[in-house]
Amino acid sequence: MYKQPRQELEAYYFEPNSVEKLRYLPVNNSRKRFCTLEPFPDSPPYNALSTATYDDTCGSCVTDELNDFKHKIREIETVMMGPDSLDLLVDCTDSFDSTASQEINGWRSTLEAISRRDLRADLVSCAKAMSENDLMMAHSMMEKLRQMVSVSGEPIQRLGAYLLEGLVAQLASSGSSIYKALNRCPEPASTELLSYMHILYEVCPYFKFGYMSANGAIAEAMKEENRVHIIDFQIGQGSQWVTLIQAFAARPGGPPRIRITGIDDMTSAYARGGGLSIVGNRLAKLAKQFNVPFEFNSVSVSVSEVKPKNLGVRPGEALAVNFAFVLHHMPDESVSTENHRDRLLRMVKSLSPKVVTLVEQESNTNTAAFFPRFMETMNYYAAMFESIDVTLPRDHKQRINVEQHCLARDVVNIIACEGADRVERHELLGKWRSRFGMAGFTPYPLSPLVNSTIKSLLRNYSDKYRLEERDGALYLGWMHRDLVASCAWK
């Protein structure tokens, strides 16, 4: 979850009161093979993971469903009552007609619920066997799991397909090579990738929550400033700053002069379809539309390589630094003696920023051993896949591509890779607090307006999302699971 979706700025010129709406880019069909994770074609049937024979059938006609149901009933009865009961069961099931459909659906739901519980339990058993070096059991469980997972099934089946991919790679000690292959093999076209990210941006409020909460803290800190410099350590498509520029434009007394320094590497350049100049030109066009004095500076280097001289800090400018979904990519002391994670925070503190915003996934996978890391990943992404399932129909022809290109790589990397090759290294907010405190930061209080604004945003989504403020931070969760945390520092 690290690629930032792009907002089409032109959409805001004609709909100033609907700043959260995005316009989808057209999607070009692509049938290129995506290494171990194969993209979903625009026409059925769905394609599953190429490294295993997954059952990716998402539905059939009523007759086939009835026959499948009869077959499952026969199997259950045969096991429970013995072969003598089979003939009786055949006679009974053959008499089913349309009036029994409600009863059939009830049984089917029960069987599916049992299957889901079994799948989760089997995934855990497989990971546990691997952690105990029980290779025979692990291989046996993988064969069983291949018949249970599906990239077009229920949330746990879809997530299970990617978890299994990671388990297979971890067992084969090929996690690094698989993840590198995922990054080397042909991506979908830029417009397709942008479309997938747009869909994820729209169906889940995670990005919007992060951007709105960070922007609220920056707007509050800069409300009396006339010259504002914002350093964004992963600017991506620059979409976060659309609403902030508009908010500054409406500020009583006129907008400040805004300078944005955008940092990014070639990973996001592909998704943009070009370099950071695309972002700068787009934001400059928007700022001009709203009569906001604007300047953009680009820094095309990896975040871990950024030096103070790259940032162009000027006297007389109020400085804001934004860390949205980026710090978890920085290796810490458990990976490298350079400890870029803490070094970067100390460097930013030396710049004397007025406010620093942090948005991160609320997950604990950084230094965890393999088995607890697997459990944390399964529980975290199960909540995320369930939230997608509520908004994006399972028969949506781009849903599989959204999950594969925007989420699956992260899952595979966390499960399969070790050392420096594991770049997805999330920490809980408590650990981030410790790091910021050691770097010399103190908490910046949240604005009540931010809380109420995000609550209004969540009304457009499922009531299973929950917003909680505690200990000076905002948490966005799905049911009982925290997924994203946001806070500010000074």
Curated annotation (Swiss-Prot):
Annotated organism of origin: Arabidopsis thaliana (Mouse-ear cress)
Region spans: VHIID: 197-262
Main location: cytoplasm
GO CC, one annotated term: cytoplasm
Gene: PAT1
Signal sequence extent: none
Recorded superkingdom: Eukaryota
Protein name according to UniProt: Scarecrow-like transcription factor PAT1
Compartments where found: Cytoplasm
